[in-house]
Structures are given as C-alpha cells and as structure tokens.
C-alpha cells in the first residue's frame, strides 16, 4: 500500500493529535509526539517499527469480490395435473483479503414447488413444498468487527505482522519465544501486539479461528378441496395438513493466540529486534 515519501497515516494522525493537544491548552514543550517521532513514521523506513496501518489498503481489502447466483424454473402439466418448480443457488464472497477472512462466504440453496391435481369435477388437491439450505463461514473477530476497528484503531500502535528475520540472531530469548508459538504466518511473520493492544482484529482473523453456521428449513402443506354445491348451494369443504421444520447450528473453532511486542535497537544503521514481550498472551 502507499508509502509516499514523508507521508503516512500514522504521521498525519500524530500531527493532528498534537494540534488537538495544543487547542486544548497543552504546552508546546510537552507535545505527545515529537517531531523526530513523526518523521520516523512519515519516512516509511521501517513500517514494522513505525507502523502505519491502513485498513483500506490492498493488503487487507480486495478490489472486488464475487457473488454468484443461478436459478431455474420448470413448469408443465395437463388438464388433470399441473406442476411448477423453482431451484436457486447463490454464493457471496467477502471483500477481506487476508487470513481466514479470505475464505468468508455466505451461500443458500433453495428448492420450492407445487402440484395441483384435478381428481374429479368436484374434488381437487394440491401439494406445496419448500426447502432451504443456508450456510456461512467467517473468521472470528473477538475485538469487534473489522469495520468497527477500522474506525477506532490507532494506526501507529501495532504492526499486525512482523518478520521473524528481523530478530537479532543473538537475541536467544526472543528466538525461543517465537519457536514456541504455533502462529507463524506464512512461515515468516509473527503477530504484533503491545501492552495496550494485547490482541487486535488482525491477530483475530489470522489466528483466533473460524465459525461455520448452517440452517435447514423445510415447509410442506397438502390439501383437498371438495365442491359440495350439489348438496347445498355455495357449500364447500377443505382439508389441509402442514409441516414446518427448521434447525440451525454453528461449529466454532476458537483459538487463543500470542502477540509479541518487540524491543528495537539499531546496529550500524540497521533496525533489529533484540527482545520480545508477549504481555501474558498465549
């Protein structure tokens, strides 16, 4: 995503935060963010040490996602019986482009139909049926929804993913911690966190599991209609039987996961991680 020189969402956020601080009567010599800090974030020289999280970038959002829908209708019959049937299916993807959310979907399969019979000049019958199968899969988001987090998450707080290769080879304790975690993303990133953000929506979507929802609905009714006008003008008799069945269930895989707050150092102009703190997350 965008890494223009001397621009970042974080730098813009911190600059505006300082302005609000001054407007509220804060002292110039006590700004929350120094000019050097803002420069480091604006330079984009190390987006892992100085993150600028853009929830709307192509790192996280697809340019487009698919919705597929197909349906078919069948009808026919003769003077004794007529029938109609409709079959439809749709599947909806998701615009999130990372972690388990890449596999999010909603789908529905529906079949409905009816048959009308003429049994005699005074008796007719009907049968109606409908069946719907609905399913959805989504990544767990324990920290409210992605879009809610996009509105409230501070862009400078946490780098969602940090390369393992940035850990100093001599930082044995940090390497041991990383070796013990089961959540190394794509074989090369660990999940970032901080004491203020023990977990976050990115970690959720990468590592906290999934939820699969299914529902089944079935409706059926059938009846007979009798014309008894030969007995008494306007007299008729109707019978009906109906069944309405529905069931729903969810299968959820809920995982806890560790995030790591790095301690950075600079050796000969190169940023390296010399320590990690999981802040109690596991």
Which ranges hold each PLM region?
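Short, hydrophobic/aromatic-enriched beta-strand segments in well-ordered soluble domains
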Residues: 222-224
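Membrane-proximal, glycine/serine-rich, low-complexity loop/turn segments characteristic
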Residues: 1-215, 220
